[in-house]
Amino acid sequence: MKTKPKSAYRRILLKLSGEALVGEEGFGIDPKVLDRMALEIKSLIEVGVQVGLVIGGGNIFRGAGLAEAGMNRVVGDHMGMLATVMNGLAMRDALQRSHVNSRLMSAIPLNGVCDDYNWAKAIRYLKQGTVVIFAAGTGNPFFTTDSAACLRGIEIEADAVLKGTKVDGVFDADPAKNPDAKLYKEIDYQLVLEKELKVMDLAAFTLARDHSLPIRVFNMNKPGALNRVVLGEDEGTTIKHCETIIEKE
């Protein structure tokens, strides 16, 4: 009889950038990437992990960019929130086609499109093994989807925020510019701030730090990386309260 792998986490908040959905399309959503991610998330449900999900909207719209060009920042951020809802609808559809129960909850009311965000219902769905997708950020302008991920992670009492990126984790320098950059295995929140390592925006990062919510940074484009992270294998970088820095060989 085949035994089910034991996960390192009971409940996670998975944060994906909107750009992660682009694939080779250059803009919008690549259906092949969406389906691959849905299958990776399905593998987590199959080992008993409860999954909350926040997706950015940068593949469709970036409010901050147009704000610099003169658009009112509040209007731009509202448009960005709607972009995250579009990504959430696409992911919900991909999950359901992969036979994974999922609910889409929006921080702004969109009757007939998705559910309103409700903390108690979200917890209930998670306990039932349903993937809960949190869309529209925090519902407020001037807050990023990274802030939304940390906020929802704290609210649902996630064991960690898993941040899927284009790189293998957190490095001591930009790996694109410095081929000798070292990858951290574990690092303390304070050292990330002191070294000015780019993980997420300051508001999101300090929120996670103040609530002792670990952040795990990994490469979502690497096949199987998400599964390895959840199973506690040596993948990516963990940011938490710790006294020593652990670098990978």
From Swiss-Prot:
HAMAP family: PyrH_B. Residues 23-28 are annotated as: Involved in allosteric activation by GTP. Keywords: Allosteric enzyme, ATP-binding, Cytoplasm, Kinase, Nucleotide-binding, Pyrimidine biosynthesis, Transferase. This is Uridylate kinase. Its EC number is 2.7.4.22. Pathway: Pyrimidine metabolism; CTP biosynthesis via de novo pathway; UDP from UMP (UMPK route): step 1/1. Homohexamer. Pfam families: AA_kinase. One of its GO terms (molecular function) is UMP kinase activity. Catalyzes the reversible phosphorylation of UMP to UDP. ATP binds at residues 15-18, 58, 62, 165, 171, 174. The keyword Acetylation does not apply. The gene is pyrH. It catalyses: UMP + ATP = UDP + ADP. UMP binds at residues 57, 77, 138-145. Belongs to the UMP kinase family. CDD domains: AAK_UMPK-PyrH-Ec. One of its GO terms (biological process) is UDP biosynthetic process. It is found in: Cytoplasm. GO terms for cellular component: cytosol.
